[in-house]
């Protein structure tokens, strides 16, 4: 039954991955591997993504695989999420608002023994999505203009299988083994705006795949009579990605291709690499009512992309803080049993891009989040809602700033699959 459930979820997840795409509208995703997504569930997103020290029996925390061992020995947990939102891009006095919507993740967790558990699922790794253009004067022609259109789309997904175990009380170890795969397409078109004119088209496609490993540990101990502290740490080594890049430049007229200027395919096992990632976290819980979390992460993106002619990867630092409060888990009142979550996080973008003068500039990203967890009738399963506000601030004037408002909806089913029935 374990293998059948695993096969069912993974097969469905791969099919859904092919459709996930509209999660970002950012011109900055043109560079590198796109916008990097945090590997967090709906519940932990409301905590700012702080989860390295989180160890709960009813939450799938794939950010630290050591947490899997906390699952109850007689339950099966399935968690999936979807999001919708709006992005607002600003450049000078110009604003552009666009709607977003996307499948986010599907994960499951179940025990193998009392001290070991397995998790599997599909999560986004990066996404690319942008549409923008500019109109410029045609050199040598009075009152003539041409338009340059840019468009990009695609995503990379993380299909993982993980396990966690508890060799002795309070100390847990875990590992995720992931397959990263996806495709991204970039198109640039020059339109001269006259009937019968030639239209240059520049097409680029990146297809990449590879493996990723995450290892984690957690150690929990009592802090006072009713408090508990859990320390967490994770590490992911830098591994190569197999990549294929296709470059196609042509000139069209109407619906026909006049000439092809370039048609190249480049394959490599070293053009792109996964970054080294190091994370430390702490969680403090009190009387099953209050939960406080904090994370620090350092991701070594430098030297992970060989082609730095357009942009340069830099090492990334990220912090996250979160808090969760439950008034009374045993109350008959739904409002008293609900979880109220809050979080904040900040990071620098892992790519630096040139400004108008050609100087490489970075950007900072800050996120505020809030959410609720609504227990279902069985008091084991949950409806999770998270609202996030994200702001991307470039470190140079004149560059595009971005604001995102996103609502994520999650369903977390906790089923008693492995309990023995007693017949009278």
What is the role of each PLM region?
Residues 1-24, 424:
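Bacterial Sec-dependent N-terminal signal peptides
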């Amino acid at each position: 039954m374990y293998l059948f459930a695993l096969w069912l979820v993974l097969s469905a997840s791969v099919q859904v991955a092919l459709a996930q795409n509209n999660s970002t509208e950012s011109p900055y995703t043109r560079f590198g591997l796109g916008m990097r997504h945090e590997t967090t569930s709906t519940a932990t997103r409301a905590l700012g993504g702080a989860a390295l020290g989180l160890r709960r029996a009813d939450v799938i925390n794939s950010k630290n695989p050591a947490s899997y061992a906390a699952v109850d020995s007689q339950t099966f947990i399935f968690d999936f999420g979807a999001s919708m939102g709006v992005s607002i891009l600003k450049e000078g006095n110009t604003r552009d608002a666009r709607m977003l919507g996307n499948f986010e993740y599907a994960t499951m967790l179940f025990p193998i023994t009392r001290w070991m558990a397995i998790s599997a699922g599909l999560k986004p790794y990066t996404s690319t999505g942008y549409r923008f253009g500019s109109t410029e004067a045609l050199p040598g022609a009075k009152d003539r203009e041409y338009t340059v259109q840019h468009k990009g789309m695609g995503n990379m997904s993380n299909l993982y299988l993980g396990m966690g175990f508890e060799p002795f009380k309070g100390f847990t170890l875990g590992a995720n083994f992931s397959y990263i795969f996806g495709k991204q397409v970039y198109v640039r078109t020059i339109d001269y705006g006259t009937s019968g004119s030639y239209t240059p088209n520049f097409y680029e496609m990146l297809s990449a795949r590879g493996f990723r490993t995450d290892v984690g540990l957690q150690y929990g101990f009592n802090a006072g009579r009713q408090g508990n502290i859990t320390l967490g740490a994770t590490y992911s080594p830098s591994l190569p990605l197999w990549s294929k890049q296709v470059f196609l430049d042509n000139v069209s007229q109407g619906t026909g291709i006049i000439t092809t200027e370039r048609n190249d395919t480049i394959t490599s096992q070293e053009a792109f690499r996964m970054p080294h990632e190091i994370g430390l976290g702490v969680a403090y819980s009190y009387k099953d009512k209050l939960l406080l979390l904090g994370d620090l992460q350092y991701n070594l993106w430098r030297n992970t992309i060989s082609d730095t002619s357009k942009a340069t990867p830099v090492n990334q630092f990220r912090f996250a803080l979160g808090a969760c409060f439950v008034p009374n888990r045993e109350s008959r009142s739904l409002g008293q049993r609900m979880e109220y979550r809050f979080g904040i996080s900040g990071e620098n973008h892992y790519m630096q891009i040139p400004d108008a003068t050609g100087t490489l500039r970075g950007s900072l990203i800050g996120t505020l989040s809030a959410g609720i967890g609504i227990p279902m009738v069985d008091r084991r399963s949950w409806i999770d809602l998270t609202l996030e506000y994200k702001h991307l601030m470039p470190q140079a004037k004149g560059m595009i700033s971005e604001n995102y408002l996103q609502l994520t909806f999650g369903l977390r089913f906790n089923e008693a699959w492995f309990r023995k029935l007693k017949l009278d």
